[in-house]
Amino acid sequence: MRGIVTIDGPSASGKSSVARRVAAALGVPYLSSGLLYRAAAFLALRAGVDPGDEEGLLALLEGLGVRLLAQAEGNRVLADGEDLTPFLHTPEVDRVVSAVARLPGVRAWVNRRLKEVPPPFVAEGRDMGTAVFPEAAHKFYLTASPEVRAWRRARERPQAYEEVLRDLLRRDERDKAQSAPAPDALVLDTGGMTLDEVVAWVLAHIRR
């Protein structure tokens, strides 16, 4: 496979799991834009930087030399040699990552990190097919109802379903400006599908 595949969608739509599996099947790297935003949010929390302080946050990110290690089996984020990956999927990070991702300077920083990776690769996020890689050869947008997505997320986190659903609905509202399918993307509702079925559907379209 040559070129770029983008897989976008809202939170807990399955895009990360699908992108990882698709990349592995194609034998190409997998890029997680969300992991970079999560790293920025985590570092802001740990350093006591206001998540809305764009200048302070960018100085922190550049000073620590944050970088993404893109691999087919998964991504890692390093900051000054420290692997941040184990700390990035927590309720605390969930609650501030949207505020961080809305900062134009941070979005530009993430996009630069992603564009440092030479194709071919599979990139997942919210606006990979629109803002970051509009030239991608294959574009997909995965979605599902908030209830389905909250149920998926609750299985992964030590949180009650109702709390997860509330957080997810708030994040959907905050992220709606960034999360929309590209005009030429194939849109799939994954609510009634297994992971294997979604991966097979995406691969079938890529291999046509």
From Swiss-Prot:
UniProt-listed GO biological process terms: pyrimidine nucleotide metabolic process
GO cellular component term of the entry, any: cytoplasm
Class of enzymatic activity (EC top level): transferase
InterPro entries membership: Cytidylate_kin, Cytidylate_kinase_dom, P-loop_NTPase
Tagged with keyword Transcription regulation: no
Pfam families, A to Z: Cytidylate_kin (PF02224)
Chain residues that bind ATP: 9-17
Reactions catalysed according to its record: CMP + ATP = CDP + ADP; dCMP + ATP = dCDP + ADP
Keyword list, A-Z: ATP-binding, Cytoplasm, Kinase, Nucleotide-binding, Transferase
GO molecular function per UniProt: ATP binding; CMP kinase activity; dCMP kinase activity
Enzyme Commission number(s) from the entry: 2.7.4.25
Gene3D superfamilies: P-loop containing nucleotide triphosphate hydrolases
Family: Belongs to the cytidylate kinase family. Type 1 subfamily.
Stored HAMAP family: Cytidyl_kinase_type1 (MF_00238)
Protein name: Cytidylate kinase
UniProt source species: Thermus thermophilus (strain ATCC BAA-163 / DSM 7039 / HB27)
